[in-house]
Amino acid sequence: MEPLPEPASGPRPRPHRLLLLSLLLLLLPLLPAPELGPRQARAEDTDWVRLPSKCEVCKYVAVELKSAFEETGKTKEVIDTGYGILDRKASGVKYTKSDLRLIEVTETICKRLLDYSLHKERTGSNRFAKGMSETFETLHNLVHKGVKVVMDIPYELWNETSAEVADLKKQCDVLVEEFEEVIEDWYRNHQEEDLTQFLCANHVLKGKDASCLAEQWSGKKGDTAALGGKKSKKKSGRAKGLGGGSSKQRKELGDLDGDPSPEEDEGIQKASPLTHSPPDEL
């Protein structure tokens, strides 16, 4: 049998090419990672911070406008315009129908949104509400009991305004300025119409997503946020028996009920300082 012909061998790689390839493989892990595009960056940010939509902003602007107009509409004050002095006729305008009331309400309306908190345990626009969120209420209760809570957020910043609420106020300033004439038109001519429908559905969100306007929060038993941050407290039987008692007695009763004062709360947490560590240590 004739021996099989040996396969033709190709050109051997040159040594300098092998060296270059080795260097590339070594340097590859050290190369910087490609930067995320705007869409990718926003997608990652949504896992932690989700800024309010225009629908959410308009919804709570309307809520606070209604509340402010209701609060200022109970007075019977009459504003003296200064006219009619020469003809000795009484001159004045009811505060409830005055320009002054409209100006005072619209100039302070956005500051009211800073009373809101972010409730991440809720969905949709209901995540914005007054009062402490369920999550932080639980954490505060743990601190009251002397439990050491480990979080990335320092204890002093627990009650600070969140990025979402700060943006809610910022967008409110822009919205009120942009739709100032619409609010004024409602105030003068259309107060019989619902302000949320008139301002948001008919103007601000016309042709846009307005689904959040229909979202409502029924609230849970004992949920302070559903009551605007106010939680009614019933007197205990011992407190009633004492008829109110002295401040010292009330303080002792408060200690027995396990409801520490703000000073005690801060003292407890200072005794158990928070340390920065990964979230999974909570």
Swiss-Prot record:
GO terms for biological process: innate immune response. The keyword Kinase does not apply. GO terms for molecular function: signaling receptor binding. The keyword Coiled coil applies. Residues 53-275 form the Saposin B-type domain. Residues 159-185 form a coiled coil. It is found in: Endoplasmic reticulum. Residues 255-266 have a biased composition (Acidic residues). It holds the Pfam family DUF3456. Disulfide bonds join 55-212, 58-200, 110-172. Keywords: Chaperone, Coiled coil, Disulfide bond, Endoplasmic reticulum, Glycoprotein, Immunity, Innate immunity, Signal. One of its GO terms (cellular component) is endoplasmic reticulum. Glycans are attached at residue 159. Residues 1-33 form the signal peptide. Residues 221-282 are annotated as: Disordered. Interacts with HSP90B1; this interaction is disrupted in the presence of ATP. Interacts with TLR1, TLR2, TLR4 and TLR9. Belongs to the canopy family. Toll-like receptor (TLR)-specific co-chaperone for HSP90B1. Required for proper TLR folding, except that of TLR3, and hence controls TLR exit from the endoplasmic reticulum. Consequently, required for both innate and adaptive immune responses. This is Protein canopy homolog 3. The gene is CNPY3.
